[in-house]
Amino acid sequence: MIPGDMGLRVTADNRPRMAVRRHGSGPDVVLFHGGMGSWRHWTRNIDALATRFTVHALDHPSYGDSATVARETTGSVYLDLVHRVFVEMFPGDAPLRLAGFSFGGAIATSLARRLAPRVTHLCLVSPGGFASRRFGDRPIRSYKEAGNDERLFREICRHNLLVNMLSDPANVTEEAVDIQADGVRRTRFDSRKVSGGGTLLGDLAQLTCRVRLLWGERDDSAFRPPIS
């Protein structure tokens, strides 16, 4: 499907510091995934974007194919690390467009502030980074509940997708469950350290680029603006 360009500096465990899949040609668009995810969160978007842009779909550190950070890494240190690796991957002053979902929204906004004026556009989908990342009474199930039961693990993946990301059961396909299961298994950093870190509003206030914020029609995030 999408070729894996893994031409990055690697760590002792032979993983890229921040893995990337590249596709298409044109101006650069960089995609940042959500918590317990990977570049595959953007599976349905990459081909469409690649008709106009060079798409760079990342695995954040400690996610997917990327190298692992220390367990005690704080949210602020994590954002600093991503920034250092990112400028190695994208040196120079060429314009950048960034898009981030949830956890990735907080990362993308932090980078947009640090890299201004290189970042010309920022698109955020139900972004994290508010001071509190609580979702009321969402009945999320723990993946630990499954133990070694693969069937139960996939059932929990399906349940949590409907609670957190997809409102229509018809959209929770086997492919969607595969993506969720793979992301959960390869998550090695607690995204809540960033998603609940309170950096988003301060970062947004300093931006001069074009910003678009999107929430799903049934997104119950406390930070979603009311529908008029």
Predicted features and spans:
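N-terminal cap/lid segment of alpha/beta-hydrolase-fold proteins
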Residues: 1-17
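Active-site loop/oxyanion-hole signature of alpha/beta-hydrolase fold enzymes
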Residues: 11-13, 56-100
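Conserved HGGG/HGGXW glycine-rich cap/lid loop of the alpha/beta-hydrolase fold
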Residues: 16-65
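Conserved catalytic-core motifs of eukaryotic protein kinase domains, centered on the activation segment
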Residues: 41-43, 66-72, 133-136, 224-226
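Gly/Ala-rich beta-loop-alpha elbow adjacent to hydrolase catalytic centers
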Residues: 100, 104, 108
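Flexible "cap/lid" loop of the alpha/beta hydrolase fold
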Residues: 109-113, 120-151
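Conserved alpha/beta-hydrolase catalytic His-Asp/Glu region
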Residues: 151-209
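Conserved loop-alpha-helix segment in the C-terminal half of the alpha/beta-hydrolase fold
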Residues: 215-228
